[in-house]
Amino acid sequence: MNLRRLSWRDHAAQQWPYALIAIALWCAMLPLGATRASASATALPAHAEWPESYRGQALRPLALSAVEQHFAAQFPGRIARFAVADGSELVLRDVNRPTRMLHPAADCWRGIGWRIEATRLERDDDALLWRCFDAVKEGQRVRVCERIVDAQGRSFTDTSAWFWAASLQQSQGPWQALTRVEDKS
C-alpha cells in the first residue's frame, strides 16, 4: 500500500475542477438571491382594488373555480377573473416576484383537457402585442390572448422571457399578467 502524503500544491491541482464548478454555480445563483432580497420592496399592497373597467368596458367580478382558488392560495400575488361587457372574460394576475407559477395560459388550458391550436402573436386595436392561441374542446372553441406588463410599462408575450428578465432584475415589478378569453364557437 503506497500511502504518500500529498503536498498542498498536488492536492490543489487535483481539486481545482471541483472548486471551479462550485464557484460557477454560486455565480449563477447570485441574481436569484438578489431578487429574493428585493421582493418585499415590490410587494403588492394588500388593499389594492381591482379595476372596474377594461378599455372602457365595465368589468363584473367572477368567482374563481375550486381549482383556481387552490392555485391562488399558493400564488405569490393575487388572481381575479372578470366578465367583460363585450362577452369575453379577463383574468388578471398580479405578481410581486419572479415565479414559475406564472406560466403560459396554454399550459393551463392543455392541463384541463383543451387542445391548443394556432399559437401566434397578434396586435390589438391599440397596437399592443399579445400571444394568442385557440383552445378547442368538445366542439367549443375559444380564443385566448395573454401578455405580462411590468411596473415601467414594458410588456412580455413569453413567460420564460419575463421570468428571466425579472429574475435578472432587467424588469421591475410588480407585474400584471392579463389573459383575455373570447368564445369563438
Where do the protein language model's features map onto the residues?
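A residue-level signal for conserved active-site and pocket-lining positions in enzyme catalytic cores
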Residues: 26, 57, 178
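Hydrophobic membrane-insertion alpha-helices, especially the h-region
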Residues: 13-34
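Alpha-helical transmembrane signal-anchor/signal-peptide segments
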Residues: 35-55
